[in-house]
Design a protein with these regions (language model features):
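Feature captures the catalytic ectodomains and active-site-proximal regions of enzymes
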Residues: 1-471
Length: 471
């Protein structure tokens, strides 16, 4: 990275918020964009961000798979794969699971357990049974792997789903252990009043049933990339306390296919909490934000009369030269205007491909792009706000499920600049600043980070239940 390393650090540390954007001019992506709504249906979430030293591998590390498969062989222990089973396989997680299974078979793994979280994309029990049968057929074919945990998932912040995760966590740490149920049993536990995704949790966990328990020197791989569920789950496993008061054996080896570069966050930021971290970075005049948007880049520079001159780049159709084109547009536009906001494509969407090789290649391109952006902005002394795909989907109008997901967390942002904040007009005369005018545009950014609002001296709407990092 460049001298400040600020982008990479914040990408590893912070969650973020989705920016709701005006539908006009946005590239339609499959059936994700509801043309009757100003909101987008985006299937993404916070990446896995473990910060224990022993969880120190990412898919960009060439030794990742060597260590992953060597551990269970060395200790004559089990390999456990944890991830989501989805009807539409939107992120290709099942393809990755199958590839991991084949690699494990080739490396001589003899005991492999699969722990599945079933998302709410399945609308009928036949659809779920078919997907489970497809996976079972594959494991039978290669003669490796068994599904030992099935749990439902929906919105993590609902109590019913916390019980699902307690069921899955119990499989890791002992106490009440997880009973493996057949697909038919899982489906029969469904709460018919609330729909198929509301699986009754209490019958999933029973005392004395040891099948599939994770313990000792076992190795765990989280093969899912994109759900804030997994950040929540791994943090509960890693820190071994909090909601469930559970602890994991120190000998347990945990790996993740996170698209973030796993690092020693505490050594980078010795501050005790996020506010201290924020203040620490602020003193260096490099403050804040990361937000998210789907598979296109959204380059938003300001014109002199505060009208937006957007540049849309369709990621799907520009995969080969996407980052070069984006960087070129950034350079050509950023020097013309006082303030530039760049929303790069979601990290999950931008890098995840149907093979590990392509995914690693895309990940490397992505981080090279971040390095180039950082270097350019700091060299040119530009005032620049970078938003990226890192975080929970908050305040998103989910048309399919008619559900509003509330914002629970503070949302940071990144301002890259060598300017002093007062000279950049971020805190003086906010009512006349370009930022104030921009943020008040109708049908543009409908939901912005509380921290960003406070930084610009603007009121935080009651609709944002998250809090500013400056508080």
């Amino acid at each position: 990275m460049g001298k400040s390393n600020i982008i990479g650090r914040f990408l590893k540390e912070y969650p973020s918020e989705l920016l709701k954007t005006d539908i006009e001019g946005i590239t339609k992506i499959g059936n994700q964009l509801d043309t009757n709504s100003s909101y987008q249906r985006i299937f993404t979430g916070k990446n896995v961000l473990p910060s224990y030293d022993r969880i120190n591998k990412s898919i960009s590390d060439s030794s990742h798979y060597h260590d992953l498969f060597e551990m269970p062989i060395k200790h004559h222990s089990s390999l456990h794969l944890v991830g989501t089973l989805s009807a539409d396989n939107f992120y290709g997680s099942q393809k990755h699971l199958e590839e991991i299974l084949k690699q494990a078979k080739g490396r001589g793994i003899f005991n492999l357990n699969i722990h599945l979280l079933i998302d709410n994309s399945f609308k009928t029990k036949e659809e779920l049974l078919s997907k489970l049968q497809e996976l079972e057929n594959f494991t039978t074919k290669i003669k490796l792997g068994r599904v030992v945990t099935i749990a439902g998932r929906d919105n993590l912040h609902q109590d019913i789903n916390l019980k699902y995760f307690k069921a899955l966590l119990a499989c890791f740490v002992g106490g009440k252990t997880n009973k493996s149920l057949s697909p038919e049993q899982i489906i029969n536990l469904s709460d018919k009043k609330d729909g198929f995704s509301k699986l009754a949790p209490t019958s999933i966990v029973e005392d004395g049933y040891q099948k599939g328990r994770i313990s000792g020197y076992d190795t765990v791989l989280f093969f899912d990339y994109n759900n804030d569920d997994y950040d929540y789950l791994i943090n509960k496993l890693v820190f071994g306390s909090g909601l469930f008061g559970l602890k994991i054996p120190k000998s347990l080896n945990i790996f993740t296919l996170s698209t973030s570069k796993v690092d020693k966050i505490k050594s980078i930021f010795p501050a005790e909490n996020k506010k201290d971290i924020f203040d620490q970075i602020s003193r260096d005049n490099k403050i804040a934000l990361i937000s998210e948007i789907s598979r296109y880049a959204y380059l938003k520079p300001f014109t002199e009369n505060n009208k937006i001159d957007p540049t849309f780049i369709d990621y799907e159709n520009n995969e080969n030269n996407f980052y070069l084109k984006l960087l070129s547009d950034l350079k050509s536009k950023s020097e013309k205007y006082e303030l530039t906001i760049l929303v790069i494509p979601t990290l999950d969407n931008a890098v995840i491909s149907d093979s590990m090789e392509k995914t690693i290649k895309s990940l490397n391109l992505y981080y090279q792009f971040l390095e180039d952006v950082e270097k350019y902005i700091l060299e040119k002394d530009l005032l620049f706000i970078l938003t990226s795909s890192y975080g929970r989907i908050n305040n998103l109008n989910n048309k399919r499920d008619n559900l509003i997901l509330p914002n629970f967390d503070p949302v940071p942002f990144i301002v890259l600049s060598k300017y002093k904040s007062e000279s950049a007009n971020l805190q003086t005369e906010p009512e006349n600043s370009i930022a104030s005018n921009y943020l008040n545009l109708k049908h543009d950014i409908l939901d912005v980070a509380p921290t960003l609002l406070q930084m610009f001296g603007l009121d935080i709407p009651d609709s944002l239940t998250g809090t500013s990092l400056l508080n």
